[in-house]
Amino acid sequence: MSKLPEYEQITTDEQLARFCGSLRGSDLLAFDTEFVSENCYRPQLCLVQVATRNKLALIDAISIKDLTPFWELIVNDVGVTIVHAAREEFLFCFRATGARPKELFDLQLVGGFIGMEYPAAYTTLVNQLTG
């Protein structure tokens, strides 16, 4: 079993620009967000968790006010974007860029297409597939 890479904690615009630059041309990128949607008109993005074949990162969306470089990366410069139940994530992306990722693999949708419970939490899908 291969060792997982160390994760990067990204808290500044400079770190974000450097990180996004290092991911350009990646064949795949998986991400998930944490946000607060209670008592607000639009959800407030707090954290973006990112994984590629050889990088892991946590992007502090509270410290970094403009995540446009990340959203532009997934729209223009990576292959497949892997997500789970990404409705809100793609609203963040669309608001920042006016576009969506070209190649999308949504685990929740795929689970539904192959006859699994829909909608289903990520943990539910993993438990059903791995026992």
Regions inferred by a protein language model and the residue ranges of each:
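Conserved DEDDh/DEDDy metal-dependent 3′-5′ exonuclease domain
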Residues: L4-F31, V36-G131
